[in-house]
């Protein structure tokens, strides 16, 4: 299974992302004989084999369904097993654009964590580039190494290292990084070690991902002391926008609605004046099994051609809460 190329059909051993709902995406490693269980039904791996990526798969018992999606770094971010707090797409996409990460870039990442952002870097630099990622926590390092190998991210080298104390150098490897991303509790301790591994032929860009403003203060001082310039702090605030159609109402519709409301109020007042009654309302028909409730009004499907519609958008009422401060800087090599 590769994150670099798309394929049409699912095969045994492939990674499939099961889209259950907007907030629930689950990774599946397809194996013959296994079953994926959800509250919406169960889904046999055997039947996934040969299906197209993007297809809707019905449940084995005829109810419920999931969509079988091809993995991308963005979808993987929403579905991966979290070992640490991760960098989500609103931040990661801005960082990649701001640092001008492109095919052929050489990226230094410290703080692999769940390897979410590592996937985005690897996909962006392509096989012509290189990602060097470092993780000091051994269990997280081993899990991330296993995932990167399974996903065939051959342009990525992961190293078990505390870069704050031991630096970034790798034996028999010329790193020459032109992009640096530090997701560390104390990036100011790692910054002095960068001079030996960043590019000596072109400018290098850096982004430090820090939740607290106190961390930003110390990071900025370390950047200035080590010759980094054009320092800027950014906070990304994202809101989700939804698109839908609103039915256009005529004046006659509005007048009719007002009449219905007025009649409803009048009827309600009359019932209140009469006081409680043991008899059910006249419009309820008695049957052998009790009283028959009135039918619900007909629901109009959005976009129905028998009505006039207007395209509309709506944003979330509140901006998502703070994730982290992004501290950017660049360093030009000495001539």
UniProtKB/Swiss-Prot annotation:
**Keywords annotated in UniProt:** Methyltransferase, Nucleus, S-adenosyl-L-methionine, Transferase, tRNA processing
Q: Where in the cell is it found?
A: Nucleus
Q: Which domain of life is it from?
A: Eukaryota
Tell me which GO cellular component terms the UniProt record holds. Answer: nucleus; tRNA (m1A) methyltransferase complex
Q: What does this protein do?
A: Catalytic subunit of tRNA (adenine-N(1)-)-methyltransferase, which catalyzes the formation of N(1)-methyladenine at position 58 (m1A58) in initiator methionyl-tRNA.
Q: For the region Disordered, give the residue spans.
A: 271-302
Q: Which gene encodes it?
A: TRM61
Basic and acidic residues bias: start-end ranges: 271-281
In Pfam terms, one family for this protein is GCD14
Family of this protein: Belongs to the class I-like SAM-binding methyltransferase superfamily. TRM61 family.
Identify the PROSITE patterns for this entry.
SAM_TRM61
Give residues annotated as binding S-adenosyl-L-methionine. Answer: 114-116, 135, 140, 162-163, 183
Q: What is its EC number?
A: 2.1.1.220
An example GO BP is:
tRNA methylation
**Would the keyword Nuclease be found if you checked this record's keyword annotation?**
no
Q: What is the lineage of its organism?
A: Eukaryota, Fungi, Dikarya, Ascomycota, Saccharomycotina
| Oligomer status and interactors | Heterotetramer; composed of two copies of TRM6 and two copies of TRM61.
Database matches in SUPFAM superfamilies: S-adenosyl-L-methionine-dependent methyltransferases
| Listed name of the protein | tRNA (adenine(58)-N(1))-methyltransferase catalytic subunit TRM61
**Which top EC class is named for this enzyme in its record?**
transferase
**Catalytic activity entry:** adenosine(58) in tRNA + S-adenosyl-L-methionine = N(1)-methyladenosine(58) in tRNA + S-adenosyl-L-homocysteine + H(+)
In its UniProt entry, the species of origin is given as: Candida albicans (strain SC5314 / ATCC MYA-2876)
Q: Could you confirm whether the keyword Transferase appears in this record?
A: yes
Give the molecular function GO annotations. Answer: tRNA (adenine(58)-N1)-methyltransferase activity
